[in-house]
Amino acid sequence: MPKRFLAPVTEQIYTLNLGPQHPSTHGVLRVLLDLDGEFIVKADPVIGYGHRGHEKMGENRLFKQFLPNTSRLDYLSGFLFNHGYVLAVEKLAGIPVPPRAQFIRTICSEFNRIASHLLWFGTYVMDLGGFTPFLYAFDDRERILDILDWVTGSRLTYSYCRFGGVDRDIDTRFTDMARDFIKRLRSRWPDYHNLVTRNIIFIHRTRGVGVITPEQARQFGVTGPNLRACGIAFDTRKAEPYEVYDQFDFEIPVGSDGDALDRYRVRFEEMEQSLRIIEQALDRLPGGPFMNDSVPTRLKPPKGEVYFAFESARGQAAYYLVSDGTPSPYRCHIRVPSFGNLHVLTEVLRGTLVADAISILGSVDLVIPEIDR
C-alpha cells in the first residue's frame, strides 16, 4: 500500500470503549479507556444514558405519588429506597409509626439486601468464568422474591411502604417462609465457599486487584461494602440508627486490603448479618396495628427541610426534601452510593491490566440507573 495512505504512528496510546453496555454492570455504562499496550493509563466513565428525571418528577407530584419512583432508582434494592423515602417524609411531617410496621419494614429491607447481594454474587462470579455459582445464587434469590411477593404483591418494584406504616400486614405463612429460607441459605454457605471463596482461580483473579485505599474512599465519597472493605467500619445502620436497627445485635464486616477479594468477602458476610437481623426481628415481632390511620391521604408537611440517610445495598443513600407547605415537595434531591463508587475507578483502574478491568468493575457492584436517575 502506498505510504500516503498510511497514517503515521505518533504515540502508543489508543482509546478503547468499554461499553456502553457490558455484562459487568447493571445498566448502560460507558468507560473510555486509554491503553498503553495491555495497561490502562486513563479511565473516564461516561454516564447519563439512563437519565429519567426522577428528581424533577418528585417535585411535580404529590408526596404519595412519588412512592413508585423510589423503587425504580436502584431496581435491585427497590425496597430499601422505598423504605428510605417513607422515613424521610415521616421525619419531615412528624408522623409516628406503629412498632409492628417498623419491624415488618426492617425484615423486608434485609431480605431485599440479601437478594441484591445474591444477584451481585452470581453475576460477578459468572463474569470471571464461574457459571455454577450463578445458578445457585439465582435459585436462592428466587426464594427471597417469592417471600417478598407474598407480602408486597411484587417481585422487583415494591411500593409497599406507606407514610405511617405498610400497605398490608404479614401472616404466619410469611414468617414460616422467612424462617425456612434462613435455614436453607445457611446450609448453602459451604457450597458457596467451596465453589468460590476457596477457588484458587477466583482468588488469583481478585487478590490484590483493584485496591481502593481509605484515602481514595474518603476523597470520592465511597460508602457501603466498598468502604468497609478498606477497613473503615462505617454502616449507617450502626452509626446513625434508624427504624429499629438499634434494637438488634449484628456486626459490621470489614476488610483490610481494599481489593476485589475483600469486597467479595464483606458482601458475603453481610448476608449472614442480615439473616441475624431478620431472625431477631421475627422473634421480637410485636403485635398491634401495622398502619397509622390518622395520616391524611393528601399529606401537607409543614414548611421545612430534611436530610435522611439510610444504608442501601450499595452504600449510604439519602433523600433531601424541602417542603413549602404544599402537597408536593419544593425540592427533591437523592444521594446515591453508586456515583462515588463509580468515580473512584478513575484512580483505581489506572495502571491495571485490561483483563482486570472487568473484575474490578464487577467487584464494585454498580447499578447505573441510580446514578443517572
From Swiss-Prot:
Listed name of the protein: NADH-quinone oxidoreductase subunit D
Membrane topology: Peripheral membrane protein
Disulfide bond annotation, renumbered to this chain: none
Reaction equation(s) it catalyzes: a quinone + NADH + 5 H(+)(in) = a quinol + NAD(+) + 4 H(+)(out)
Subunit description: NDH-1 is composed of 14 different subunits. Subunits NuoB, C, D, E, F, and G constitute the peripheral sector of the complex.
Leading EC class: translocase
Keyword flag Transmembrane helix: no
GO molecular function: NAD binding; NADH:ubiquinone reductase (non-electrogenic) activity; quinone binding
GO CC terms of this entry: plasma membrane
Gene that produces this protein: nuoD
Database matches in PANTHER family: NADH DEHYDROGENASE [UBIQUINONE] IRON-SULFUR PROTEIN 2, MITOCHONDRIAL (PTHR11993:SF10), NADH-UBIQUINONE OXIDOREDUCTASE 49 KDA SUBUNIT (PTHR11993)
Classification of source organism: Bacteria, Pseudomonadati, Thermodesulfobacteriota, Syntrophobacteria, Syntrophobacterales
HAMAP family (UniProt xref): NDH1_NuoD
